[in-house]
């Protein structure tokens, strides 16, 4: 080991089993979505899977007001269980809203459990959701809930008619059958979330932003000006809510364009589903084009959508729309707003556009390509540790508790987004981690992509490993 604490021999860069376990935890876990009509027991099932009371459970349809995700562990397997949100149903809009929920789930989850009340049987809404899920190509499991009697057992058997295979008879309230259901699900659930695994086909783009910011206008401009909406690409299954558009000589998949085109107020629950669809579009995308109204001050809504994007870890392009309405005074104010409000996303490329006039819209394509290239980037372990050695020698970590922590070793655990794990002898202050991120960007680029830095505290090989922080 060198004096500054980094490893000098490349043989020391090989990871032991404990290190590999740390790296596995850095990879995004697969997502299991729990979907179904209101009051069929979705949140009760989530709580049963988690082994603790997390999801709000009341005997009132629509009590879940948003899509909520929880980290879960079953027989040593990590995964994320997603409690899809409820709504205030009415007789007219119920079927459409259940279908909407299933549509979001099938694009953002790696597997789906459809929960049906066995004592009621398959309703029209249940069957509509089943049809959508069958088209998704994702693993789908049917949970026949509220099976607490012999009669309910017989009722569950009638659900074979839904075409989803064997109905798994469960009682989320009492735990019956849930373990067997999970064992079956985990056999089909991938080890890592598919959203971050390399795959073929067009790159996935989400246009997001607050209402009336110009998402639909931009989509129409991109599709209409190019005269190149693609309906059939070999080997590609297209979700009805997506659009394939050729831009810059390649085909891009714009996710959830049906959500952009639908008129506000067309169905009950639209305000709730505006939020759900935004989250769903971000989760389904690889790169997010975040539209901001350049002619108006930044709002809380802008910042909420921005938080969703950062949390999801997607590549990002900031599109300042309505630039045709911006005068010199507004430009000065906007620059100050960006410096003050968007400090956490300075790494995103900014493109000033007008969806209405078409100004600079073509510049979005190279910005998206740059962001995706950064998002996909992997730094080999050798160059990464050589870089760490130079940085630490010039600027060591600050002393903490009378001791100076040393960075022993660094590796990139995953791409999409680039996630780095630093093995250290002590905790690194948040300020020093931000410093390392800045230096990473200066050296390796990463324009348009978030970077995640995780710290694992350990001693030199052969020493007792302290707890993680």
Curated annotation (Swiss-Prot):
PROSITE patterns: G_ENGA. GTP 2 binds at residues 209-216, 256-260, 321-324. Keywords: GTP-binding, Nucleotide-binding, Repeat, Ribosome biogenesis. SUPFAM superfamilies: P-loop containing nucleoside triphosphate hydrolases. Residues 30-193, 203-376 form the EngA-type G domain. It comes from the Bacteria. InterPro entries: AAA+_ATPase, G_ENGA, GTP-bd, GTPase_Der, KH_dom-like, KH_dom-like_a/b, P-loop_NTPase, Small_GTP-bd. Transmembrane segments: none annotated. CDD domains: EngA1, EngA2. Residues 377-459 form the KH-like domain. SMART domains: AAA. One of its GO terms (molecular function) is ATP hydrolysis activity. Pfam families: KH_dom-like, MMR_HSR1. GTP 1 binds at residues 36-43, 83-87, 145-148. GO terms for biological process: ribosome biogenesis. GTPase that plays an essential role in the late steps of ribosome biogenesis. PANTHER family: GTPASE DER. HAMAP family: GTPase_Der (MF_00195). Associates with the 50S ribosomal subunit. Belongs to the TRAFAC class TrmE-Era-EngA-EngB-Septin-like GTPase superfamily. EngA (Der) GTPase family. This is GTPase Der.
């Amino acid at each position: 080991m060198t004096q500054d604490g980094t490893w000098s021999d490349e043989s020391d860069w090989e990871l032991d089993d404990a290190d590999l376990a740390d790296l596995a935890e850095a990879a995004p876990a697969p997502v299991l979505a729990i979907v179904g009509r209101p009051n069929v027991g979705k949140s009760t099932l989530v709580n049963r899977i988690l082994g603790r009371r997390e999801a709000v459970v009341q005997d009132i349809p629509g009590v879940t007001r948003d899509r909520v995700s929880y980290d879960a562990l079953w027989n040593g397997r990590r995964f994320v269980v997603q409690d899809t949100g409820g709504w205030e149903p009415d007789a007219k809009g119920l079927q459409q809203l259940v279908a909407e929920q299933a549509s979001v789930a099938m694009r953002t989850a790696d597997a789906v459990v459809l929960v049906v009340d066995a004592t009621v049987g398959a309703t029209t809404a249940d069957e509509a959701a089943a049809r959508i899920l069958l088209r998704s190509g994702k693993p789908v499991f049917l949970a026949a809930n509220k099976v607490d009697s012999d009669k309910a057992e017989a009722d569950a058997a009638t659900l074979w008619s839904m075409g989803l295979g064997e109905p798994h008879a469960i009682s989320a309230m009492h735990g019956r059958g849930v373990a067997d259901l999970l064992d079956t699900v985990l056999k089909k659930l991938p080890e890592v979330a598919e959203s971050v695994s390399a795959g073929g086909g067009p790159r996935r783009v989400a246009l997001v932003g607050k209402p009336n910011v110009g998402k639909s206008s931009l989509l129409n401009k991109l599709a209409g000006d190019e005269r190149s909406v693609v309906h059939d690409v070999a080997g590609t299954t297209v979700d009805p809510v997506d659009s394939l558009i050729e831009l810059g000589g390649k085909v891009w998949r714009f996710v959830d364009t049906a959500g952009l085109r639908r008129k506000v107020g067309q169905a009950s629950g639209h305000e709730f589903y505006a939020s759900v669809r935004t989250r769903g579009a971000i989760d389904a995308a690889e790169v997010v084009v975040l539209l901001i109204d350049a002619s108006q001050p930044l709002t809380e809504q802008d910042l909420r959508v921005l938080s969703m994007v950062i949390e999801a870890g997607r590549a990002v392009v900031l599109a300042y729309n309505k630039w045709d309405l911006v005068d010199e005074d507004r430009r000065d104010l906007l620059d100050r707003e960006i410096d003050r409000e968007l400090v956490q996303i300075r790494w995103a490329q900014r493109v000033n556009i007008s969806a209405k006039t078409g100004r600079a819209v073509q510049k979005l394509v190279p910005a998206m390509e740059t962001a995706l290239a950064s998002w996909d980037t992997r730094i080999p372990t050798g160059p990464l540790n050589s870089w760490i050695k130079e940085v630490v020698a010039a600027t060591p970590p600050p002393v903490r508790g009378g001791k100076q922590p040393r960075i022993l070793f660094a590796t990139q655990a995953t791409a999409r987004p680039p996630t780095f794990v630093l093995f250290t002898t002590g905790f690194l202050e948040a300020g020093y981690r931000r410093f390392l991120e800045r230096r990473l960007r200066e050296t390796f680029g990463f324009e348009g992509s978030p970077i995640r830095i995780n710290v694992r505290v350990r001693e030199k090989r052969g020493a007792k490993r302290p707890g993680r922080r």
